[in-house]
Amino acid sequence: MNSLFTSAFSPLAVSLGLLLVMTSAFPTPGPLGEDFKNDTTPSRLLLTTPEKTEALIKHIVDKISAIRKEICEKNDECENSKETLAENKLKLPKMEEKDGCFQSGFNQAICLIKTTAGLLEYQIYLDFLQNEFEGNQETVMELQSSIRTLIQILKEKIAGLITTPATNTDMLEKMQSSNEWVKNAKVIIILRSLENFLQFSLRAIRMK
């Protein structure tokens, strides 16, 4: 009787075993950017590939686009705010020839250092964005979280060659404005500049 029972269920047991192995080997993929949420431990970051880092940057750019779109739905002139850049005196980090991120004179090491330092400088402007943006705060918080994760990944690559700058609360106060149009213009300029900054960094990120 025991022999018959064993022989009858052996194929089922083997099939279940194979199914478990296949499930472990091919996990269900999550949405873009999910791998980077709530996990910035050193061991996790060391396993990050250039492809995953590039995917994270594209995820950040998508969040930037979503915020810009939300603002523009309420303000028809939101994308025509370039002329206010000089007036608002926003000293936003931007790439220059010496930073090694352009095709001409490209230098991966220098570009990674500039990218990391620039993103750290952008933190004060992202704080302004969070304080002034009246739309979906969850999107803004996710943007900030993703950028912090990217900074940690880049710090691993450059082996701590830069330090985190002190928070400039005076600058944050100077950026405040009671004028709704000027406030929205500043937010749009910050988002546009951040997106351009990230696009220039991609060449260094893609290289292994």
From Swiss-Prot:
Gene3D superfamilies: 1.20.1250.10. Transmembrane segments: none annotated. GO terms for molecular function: cytokine activity; growth factor activity; interleukin-6 receptor binding. Disulfide bonds join C72-C78, C101-C111. SMART domains: IL6. The modification Phosphoserine is found at S81. This is Interleukin-6. It comes from Capra hircus (Goat).
